């Protein structure tokens, strides 16, 4: 039996070169699932995405998903894509195994915590305050550079990574410190900034919003002193005071100390984000 992809709709195109299309997964012309492919506007038309790959239950565990994934990669190659991205639910063990077997490498993961009714107290002696306008410009330049470098370190071309960083700050901090729903705080040691926390809100799933940690940074000289934990507890307080019951974040693969911290605070991984070169 032959597994193929058959277009289920016309090719959708955007003025900036973006593409998307839904395909039926077929076995000898019999529909057994569906695939949705697109290009990623955050990284440009050369970065493809398998947004969804579904095989109907009766046809699972027969290699249909693997063949459909490989066929999807060929479609993305024909679009001029040089990489493909996927986001797999953390509890989808079969899909995660398939991704690893096909050569996908984890780049990052999304994590979420269900918040307690009472916000946590900050550790004794920890001083935090809102960021000032005088501090904002230097912080933003450093934050964008660090965010871009994290993507570069994981195989994203420098130009795409820097575009992604600029786009993220433009989207989520359009008015700087005055952006509605955004808070940027500083943790202070001996009167000097020792770390920063940027929080806001995000749509975790369609129609479902939650508080979100966009960035957290502790100065290298101050690490190992509990400031990262204190800033995360502050994020929980901010979220609960705003009425949110969940707090989400995004962490890059390989940042083991951060992942361990988040897990110790009760965060669980919801999505594993991976990529593969198509060259």
Give residue ranges: language-model regions.
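Active-site rim helix/loop that mediates acceptor-substrate recognition in acyltransferases
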Residues: 2-28, 36, 159-184
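Conserved beta-strand in the GNAT
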Residues: 24, 30-39, 47-49, 54, ...
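A short, internal acetyl-CoA/4′-phosphopantetheine-binding micro-motif in the GNAT/acyltransferase core
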Residues: 50-62, 88-90, 214-223
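Conserved acetyl-CoA pyrophosphate-binding loop and the N-cap/start of the following alpha-helix
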Residues: 59, 63-71, 222, 226-231
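Conserved active-site alpha-helix within GNAT-family acetyltransferase domains
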Residues: 66, 90-108, 229, 253-271
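Conserved GNAT acetyl-CoA-binding A-motif
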Residues: 76-89, 239-250
């Amino acid at each position: 039996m032959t597994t193929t992809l058959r277009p289920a709709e016309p090719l959708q195109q955007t003025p900036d070169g973006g593409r998307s299309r839904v395909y039926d997964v077929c076995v000898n012309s019999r529909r057994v699932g569906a695939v949705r492919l697109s290009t990623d506007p955050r990284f440009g038309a050369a970065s493809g995405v398998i947004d969804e790959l579904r095989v109907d239950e009766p046809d699972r565990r027969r290699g249909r998903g693997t063949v459909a994934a490989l066929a999807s990669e060929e479609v993305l190659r024909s679009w001029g894509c040089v990489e493909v991205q996927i986001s797999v639910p953390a509890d989808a063990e079969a899909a995660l195994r398939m991704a690893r077997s096909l050569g996908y490498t984890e780049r990052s993961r999304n994590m979420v915590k269900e918040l307690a009714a009472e916000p946590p107290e900050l550790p004794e002696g920890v001083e935090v305050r809102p960021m000032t306008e005088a501090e904002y410009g230097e912080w933003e330049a450093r934050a964008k550079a660090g965010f871009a470098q994290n993507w570069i370190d994981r195989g994203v071309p420098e130009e795409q990574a820097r575009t992604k960083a600029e786009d993220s700050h433009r989207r989520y901090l359009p008015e700087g410190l005055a952006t509605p729903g955004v808070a940027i705080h500083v943790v202070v040691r001996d009167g000097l900034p020792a770390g920063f926390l940027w929080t806001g809100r995000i749509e975790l799933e369609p129609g479902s919003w939650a508080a979100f940690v966009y960035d957290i940074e502790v100065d290298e000289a101050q690490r190992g002193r509990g400031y990262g934990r204190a800033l995360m507890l502050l994020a929980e307080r901010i979220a609960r005071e705003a009425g949110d019951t969940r707090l989400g974040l995004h962490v890059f693969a390989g940042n083991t100390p951060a992942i361990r911290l988040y897990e110790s605070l009760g965060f669980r991984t919801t999505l594993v984000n991976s990529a593969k070169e198509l060259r």
